[in-house]
């Protein structure tokens, strides 16, 4: 309890409903060696050149299986083995970070919550803020002892393509698109067969909730206005999609941060990689 209260202090000043979902750099610098804290570096590159002390590296690709339709999730057994190898137990406080404002870290947050582990936070500002403040780094590779980790029923949900089809133009579900305008317009295909967007989806670019310089999250009032202006109500069921589930996870994390009911948040994890490569999925090409 003392640990949670301490890490909440900085985030509380920004007005977040769930300040425990973020830790700041000052807090982390004081808790690098805490026995029950596991720091996870999710940057695609750079870990070997230097990282936050005590951080273990996780390949973000390991938490999505592109061949596992319709959910695209690693199996419970695969996820248990992955967390165990990182030294994460069911009581571990996980702190995730990357160099892109949480785009990779948020996907770990989402899948941990999906598999029943809610004791996870993002480092606000991530590697960008940590490095800018010239905080300690090293290139040592920790070797944590494997610890038992068991999945259980979580809060957030995964949506399948069939469920998304059913949600098109539905009054019971808000469908958000976390991708760039170029992707939505169908001009930026990113190796996908077809471009465009899902009918009735609302553009909600993931990075618009971040400070453009520090990559830290904007205050709660600004984030709430961002989603309110998109027509997202506090009690709405929300499904978010992007290309491979990362940017969608970031939108979901941000909604959770400002107090949205986690049981009403879903990630279409097949994402545009599935939707745009299928021939039976309806696609719009103009907003």
Task: Report residues per predicted region.
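Sec-dependent signal peptide recognition
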Residues: 1-4
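Cytosolic catalytic domains that perform sulfur/thiol-centered chemistry
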Residues: 7-287
């Amino acid at each position: 309890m003392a640990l949670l209260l301490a890490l909440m202090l900085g985030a509380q000043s920004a007005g977040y409903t769930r300040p425990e979902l973020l830790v700041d750099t000052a807090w982390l610098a004081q808790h690098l060696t805490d026995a029950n804290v596991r720091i996870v570096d999710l940057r695609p590159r750079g870990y070997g050149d230097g990282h936050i002390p005590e951080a273990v590296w996780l390949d973000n690709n390991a938490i999505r299986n592109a061949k596992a339709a319709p959910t695209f999730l690693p199996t419970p057994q695969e996820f248990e083995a992955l967390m165990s190898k990182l030294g994460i137990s069911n009581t571990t406080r996980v702190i995730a970070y990357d160099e892109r404002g949480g785009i990779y870290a948020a996907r770990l947050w989402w899948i941990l919550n999906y598999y029943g582990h809610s004791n996870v936070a993002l480092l606000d500002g991530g590697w960008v803020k940590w490095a800018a403040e010239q905080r300690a780094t090293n290139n040592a590779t920790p070797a944590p002892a494997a610890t038992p980790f068991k999945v259980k029923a979580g809060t957030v949900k995964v949506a399948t393509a069939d469920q998304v089809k059913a949600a098109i133009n539905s009054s019971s579900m808000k469908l958000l698109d976390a991708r760039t305008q170029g992707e939505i317009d169908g001009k930026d295909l990113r190796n996908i067969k077809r471009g465009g967007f899902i009918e009735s989806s609302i553009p909600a670019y993931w990075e618009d909730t971040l400070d453009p310089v520090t990559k830290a999250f904007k205050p709660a009032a600004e984030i709430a206005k961002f989603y309110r202006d998109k027509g997202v109500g506090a009690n709405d069921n929300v499904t978010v999609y992007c290309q491979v589930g990362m940017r969608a996870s970031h939108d979901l994390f941000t909604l959770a941060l400002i107090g949205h009911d986690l049981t009403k948040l879903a990630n279409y994890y097949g994402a545009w990689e599935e939707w745009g490569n299928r021939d039976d999925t309806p696609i719009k090409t103009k907003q």
